[in-house]
Design a protein with these regions (language model features):
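Membrane-water interface segments that mark the loop-to-transmembrane alpha-helix transition
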Residues: 10-26, 50-51, 56, 60-105, ...
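Interfacial segments at transmembrane-helix termini and the short loops linking adjacent helices
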Residues: 42-46, 105-122, 313-342
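Signature of the first transmembrane helix
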Residues: 9-64, 89, 98-102, 125, ...
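Hydrophobic alpha-helical transmembrane segments
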Residues: 49, 116-123, 149-199, 257, ...
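Helix-loop junctions and terminal segments of transmembrane helices
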Residues: 59-78, 141, 256, 260-285, ...
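Interhelical loop/hinge segments that connect adjacent transmembrane helices in multipass membrane
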Residues: 1-7, 111, 146, 150-151, ...
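Transmembrane helical elements of multi-pass membrane transporters/channels
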Residues: 14-29, 154-155, 159, 175-196, ...
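Membrane-interface junctions at transmembrane-helix termini in multi-pass inner-membrane proteins
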Residues: 8, 12, 69-78, 128-154, ...
Length: 416
């Protein structure tokens, strides 16, 4: 399958380019994880997981998802306006979150049993996360895949280096969080100047800005809530587990996603960047992108099946050996979540057809149903105080959700 995707075309070259860079970038946090698990405790990982949950959910809200539309306009000027629109939204709502936290910080910290004001970093993390997504969308439109790779690599390595150094040289309970913010700042600054030069507007028109906000209103109306539901479906776990179980349990669960889902996320994201461009081109030209859909499906399945099968069989032994006996429990979670990881890997690029075909209402409905499944799983797991039952239900819900996405996106790949 991989031989069929050797660089015989721009599409194949782009996939190889992005996958190579993504493979290196995702390898860095995984490679340093055995070091971090011996520097930071599961509880500290749990607090970091809570921080990441808030910035992931927040970043999906603050741009109103207008950055997702940057690829779509045929006119370059309209895409430039969308960069400004999504950036203004991101700045405004990030500042709003900061003000709200300043007003209620004590209540917030007490509720989540956090001693230090570590969540002052959350609004900054949200803004950096959102701006970075906007900049990458523009770079993707310009097909600057090598620059995207370079930037991802710098962000990943910067965060990882800071996390190790902070833990060794100046052991603070929120070292993971501070390091994450610093790494994101570096990544944004490196790409920001080039993008600002490319998106300069000779005459800024408020009328046109409002017109484009209305033109792409489906994105805040449907894509934003769908994305929020999808992200919350996973990140809600890190918010609920510390309350009903412990921060230690949240930290163990977080390590599984760091090790298991990070490479899947990077590989899926890399292929998505190229697939969505090729899918748009094929749909415009042939009114169908089923051929490339099938090729990507088989490629992703072949990439994921064997590593995840190994995790399913020997998860506990692998985790205890690599990360230390203290993290053996995380290996059991990994065994349960491995099937979900495979479905997620396959679905993540292919489900972008919901956006390309502007079937955002349908996507929102599916995301809402999935969110309900997750909430029910959390209620049952927390009611019985059984973390294994909870993880099993979360895995099953995710498998069903991604299977539905795959089936529907396959149908969408064939024109109308």
């Amino acid at each position: 399958m991989i031989n069929k995707l050797k660089p015989k075309s721009d599409f194949s070259k782009n996939i190889v380019t992005l996958m190579t860079g993504s493979a290196i970038a995702q390898a860095i946090p995984i490679l340093i994880s055995p070091i971090l698990t011996r520097i930071y405790t599961p509880e500290e990982f749990g607090i970091f997981a809570l921080y990441m949950a808030f910035i992931s959910i927040g970043a999906s809200i603050v741009t109103a998802k207008y950055e997702t539309a940057i690829l779509l306009p045929k006119k370059e000027e309209n895409a430039k306006y969308l960069v400004y629109i999504s950036s203004i939204f991101a700045l405004f709502f990030s500042l709003l979150f900061f003000i709200v936290y300043m007003l209620f910080s004590d209540k917030f910290n007490n509720f989540f049993k956090v001693e230090n004001d570590v969540f002052y970093f959350v609004p900054f993390g949200i803004f950096l996360f959102a701006i970075y997504a906007i900049l990458l969308q523009w770079a993707n439109r310009k097909k600057e895949y090598k620059n995207m790779n370079k930037n991802r690599l710098i962000q990943s390595s910067s965060i990882s280096i800071f996390q190790v150094l902070t833990g060794i040289l100046n052991k603070i309970s929120f070292g993971l969080i501070v390091s994450d913010v610093m790494g994101r700042v570096i990544a944004v600054l490196l790409i920001l100047n080039r993008v600002l030069q490319q998106v300069k507007l000779e005459n800024f028109s408020l009328k046109k800005t409002i017109s484009l906000i209305k033109r792409y209103k489906k994105f805040p109306k449907y894509e934003m809530p769908a994305t929020v539901l999808n992200i919350t479906s996973y990140e809600l776990v890190y918010i609920i587990i510390p309350i009903y179980f412990s921060s230690v349990t949240a930290g163990l669960y977080f390590l599984v996603f760091r090790v298991l889902m990070t490479p899947i996320g990077f590989i899926g994201s890399a292929i998505t960047e190229v697939f969505k461009n090729r899918a748009i081109e094929d749909l415009n030209k042939y009114n169908s992108c089923r051929r490339i859909y099938k090729k990507i499906f088989l490629l992703l399945f072949s990439i994921g099946i064997f590593p995840l099968l190994i995790v399913t069989i020997w998860g506990q032994s692998i985790f205890s050996f690599i990360f230390g006996e203290e993290w053996k429990e995380a290996g059991l979670y990994a065994q349960i979540l491995a099937p979900l990881a495979l479905f997620r890997l396959i679905s993540s690029p292919l489900s972008y057809l919901f956006i390309i075909k502007e079937k955002l209402e349908l996507d929102l409905l599916i995301q809402f149903i999935f969110f309900i499944f997750i909430v029910i799983s959390l209620i049952i797991g927390c009611f019985y105080k059984d973390i294994y039952l909870l993880v099993s239900l979360l895995s099953l819900s995710g498998c069903i959700f991604y299977l539905i996405q795959i089936i529907i996106s396959f149908r969408l790949s064939n024109g109308n």
